[in-house]
Amino acid sequence: MLADEPSTNAAASEPSVKLAVCVLASGSKGNAIYVSDGQTAILIDAGLSGVEIERRLDSRGLAPDRLQAIVVSHEHADHIGGVGVLSRRYRLPVYLNRKTAGATKRIGRLHRVNTFDCGTVFHVDNLHIHPFSLSHDA
């Protein structure tokens, strides 16, 4: 293709999206995933202690104080263990579905709660999050 010819490659005209995903923990003892587009950083679940999540973020050069939110997938203990502590310590809003919001007594006081409906897209700054339902056994 010559330089002055129009591009027929649709991907060439699409904006470049960079997404960093770091699995901090995955398993029955705790789940936590760091997601960032370079400007907005969130945690999906915080199932370890707040101190352990901070330690794992720090060990990967990720600053806990740069997080903008925690998104909780569901209310099982291995997904919510550090949510309350991190939300209070870093003044992070917590996004959870309505059913999970009913379990916040186990999480403790949260800085700010935002509920979402599965199937409805919501945004945390630049990140577009499309939650959906799955069956999950404990």
In which residue ranges do the predicted regions lie?
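Short, flexible loop segments at the rims of nucleotide/cofactor-binding pockets, characterized by
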Residues: A20-V23, S49, I70-S73, P131-L134
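Active-site metal-binding motif and surrounding structural segment of the metallo-beta-lactamase
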Residues: G50-L96, N114
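Short beta->alpha connector loops
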Residues: S26-S28, L48-G50, H76-A77, L134-A138
